[in-house]
């Protein structure tokens, strides 16, 4: 009986190793510093900058200029 339990335990440990299960520290929500330094962030993406520039600098009351939101938040008006 003990040898059957030993074989079963060995098989279970080989098929489902404990280190393969995700731990709490492996979750992205637990690592905010790494999320903030992500190279794929939307602020650094070239398409995001183009949308901001198009929305901010080209649509200001029919003339080329920056809206109030863009003056406060956008790179197109010189604020970083």
Curated annotation (Swiss-Prot):
The cysteine framework is III (CC-C-C-CC). The modification Cysteine amide is found at residue 77. It is found in: Secreted. Its main location: secreted. GO terms for cellular component: extracellular region. GO terms for molecular function: ion channel inhibitor activity; sodium channel regulator activity; toxin activity. This is Mu-conotoxin BuIIIC. Belongs to the conotoxin M superfamily. Expressed by the venom duct. Residues 1-22 form the signal peptide. Disulfide bonds join 56-70, 57-76, 66-77. Residues 23-51 form a propeptide. The analog R2-Midi BuIIIC is a potent inhibitor of Nav1.2/SCN2A (IC(50)=34.1 nM). It also inhibits Nav1.3/SCN3A (10% inhibition at 75 nM), Nav1.4/SCN4A (45% inhibition at 75 nM), Nav1.6/SCN8A (45% inhibition at 75 nM), but does not inhibit Nav1.5/SCN5A and Nav1.8/SCN10A (75 nM tested). The inhibition is slowly reversible. It comes from Conus bullatus.
């Amino acid at each position: 009986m003990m040898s059957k339990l030993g074989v079963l335990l060995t098989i279970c440990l080989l098929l489902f190793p404990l280190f393969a299960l995700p731990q709490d520290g492996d979750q992205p929500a637990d690592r905010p510093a790494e999320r903030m330094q992500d190279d794929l962030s939307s602020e650094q993406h070239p398409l995001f900058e183009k949308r901001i520039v198009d929305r901010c600098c080209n649509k200001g009351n029919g003339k080329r200029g920056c809206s109030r939101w863009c003056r406060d938040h956008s790179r197109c008006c010189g604020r970083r």
